[in-house]
């Protein structure tokens, strides 16, 4: 079956995990290039061993590769700052861009929430690993209630799974995730916190989601959450609730003070998640890699399927 060649810029943890997923699991994509800036990186060495064209000269090196003209889709797994530069060049060259950094130049995309709604945009943004894991839960509460006043997420990932790109983007992570909690999650106000856990042996990715909502019943909220978990599990099998959803009534007689909002009452929902990785590159504790790369692959595969249909027509 014909496949569309793609390139990955960024040979770190996320880029390498994505490469392995494409080679093992993609229905409509094939690796055309792996791009890095460190000639000694494990990702480039692994790509070369697997027969993938490689360059350690960044995007300039990618453009020099003889098969660059055949590459239709480029995944950027570098950093928010680098993506701005890379995207400008790739758009001029007519490439479809999947952004795995928190740069958020293109529209936010979380497959379980907005599916293929942005599939034809020249650049789509995959939010962040914490956003991919938690924002579906905020959305699940929102669709079962009249309003979600506050959505707050805490993403705890193993320090070992966070490469230099992730560490350089902590501020962008919190800003982009907070914004996406509001835009995709439907919360009126969003807040995001990331924790790099240095524990040894490394701990699996854990996420906690807090919402304060009005309207809707506990039963309808819980069912909506379970349905959303099932939707995410279709492309991330290791995604699951860590324990039963917790509820707490915040009455008018004892309201909570929300920053920038004031005193509020409603139903507080606490959702605890665990994301186990598929261990394609790093071990299973790195669920943060898995949920990000799986979401990007699903979106790209759907786009590639559409392109192949157009070419066949």
From Swiss-Prot:
GO terms for molecular function: acetaldehyde dehydrogenase (acetylating) activity; NAD binding. One of its GO terms (biological process) is catabolic process. Its EC number is 1.2.1.10. It comes from the Bacteria. The active site is at 129 (acyl-thioester intermediate). InterPro entries: Acetaldehyde_dehydrogenase (IPR003361), Acetylaldehyde_DH_C (IPR015426), NAD(P)-bd_dom_sf (IPR036291), Semialdehyde_DH_NAD-bd (IPR000534). Keywords: Aromatic hydrocarbons catabolism, NAD, Oxidoreductase. The keyword Protein biosynthesis does not apply. It holds the Pfam family AcetDehyd-dimer. Gene3D superfamilies: Dihydrodipicolinate Reductase, domain 2, NAD(P)-binding Rossmann-like Domain. SMART domains: Semialdhyde_dh. It is an enzyme of class 1 (oxidoreductase). The keyword Lyase does not apply. It catalyses: acetaldehyde + NAD(+) + CoA = acetyl-CoA + NADH + H(+). NAD(+) binds at residues 11-14, 161-169, 288. Belongs to the acetaldehyde dehydrogenase family. This is Acetaldehyde dehydrogenase. It comes from Methylocella silvestris (strain DSM 15510 / CIP 108128 / LMG 27833 / NCIMB 13906 / BL2).
